[in-house]
Amino acid sequence: MKNLTTPQAILYRTTRPSLARYYTAGVTSICLYAIMYDKGGMSRSEREIGAIGASIVNRCIYCASVHASRHAQLTKSDEVTDKIFADGENAKLSARDAAILKFSVKLSDTPSRADKDDFNELKTVGLNEEEILDLILSTSLFGWANRLMHVLGDPVRPTVNED
């Protein structure tokens, strides 16, 4: 499944292609591009940290690796993602990256635990309200996508005709 977009990966995994086509044609494509590629607000690489946090909590190895790869591509370094994969939420990151990861993990683990103190911590490290919204959206989108990836079944591989 290397190099597949999230909608393609879900289509690849599903045992009900009609459902996956609906999913990929509509909701995910619109949300994915609106949330991850929108101009302004949080940087693309920081949105990827939010998605990595969600994918780690949900144990979606495929998605975590895709987001890590994208983060490394955007920043031209795999230092941050290597630290995250080695030490999880305790990774020694910049204050801003650490706060982004911590919040995305908390939001993914137990959404109702996210509170004013978390928002204040994000503001303390320099995030504005628009960036915080982008973080909530990117983390939530991939928390949802991770859950779908886990339950749609095993990958459907094309059969080879040996005639």
Show which residues each predicted segment covers.
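Hydrophobic alpha-helical segments
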Residues: 1-163
